[in-house]
Amino acid sequence: MVEVQASLAPFINQEFVVTGAWGEPRSGHIHAGIDLASLGTGSNAQPIYSMSDGIVTRVDQTDQGTGYGAMCIIWNQNNNDLWLYGDLGDNSIPLTVGQTVQQGQQVGVEGNPAGTASTGLHVHLEKENQSDGIFKFGYNNSIDPTTGTGILNEVYTSSDEYYIYDGTPIPPSAEEKKGFNWPVFTKVIRERNNMGGFLLWKKRKWKN
């Protein structure tokens, strides 16, 4: 196997693999997201972290008949990206609707919901871009969630690459710098918090 350093991921300092690709045929539908699973952790569900700043628009602590299991949706109002984190562990989401979230903040843990096309503990990651902040659901409304992350949209086999992400945020693009109050991470504080999860960061604001 070959380790690849991803530039953005819902796992931090944890090896993981792709177990379900975006756009692959499923029973009666096309997979609108990508499934990612921690590697080498057995039955220990690993923390899942937000891939962007944003506002929480939906929280389901258990499956509400959607097929997504426990899930949350975060809307980045600066670029209108909506990220759905599905198939999380029941009652593991430490968020409420309307809450502001920062990139790298924990949104839950991996789950293995009954009644889904599950491949063991994993997170289902789905992405849309909607100016109204409303997640529309379905493959036709989705965009490839691996774009710009360094993760290939290909299901893992034992001879394939696996990934690890160390928590270093992607610098904002020139277009993003024009936005209001875009944070940029300028100094890494090499200290882990007591949740065992992610690196802490000192922030400043871009000056237009």
Question: Residue ranges of each PLM-predicted region?
Answer:
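Acidic, glycine-rich catalytic/binding loops that coordinate metals and/or anionic ligands
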Residues: 2-14, 40-42, 93-102, 124-187, ...
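Zn2+-dependent peptidoglycan hydrolase active-site motif and core
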Residues: 31, 50-94, 113-127
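Surface-exposed, glycine-biased beta-strand/turn segments
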Residues: 1-70, 79, 103, 158-175
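Short beta-strand segments
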Residues: 46, 81-84, 141-143
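Intrinsic-disorder-associated, low-complexity terminal segments enriched in Asp/Asn/His/Tyr and depleted
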Residues: 193-194
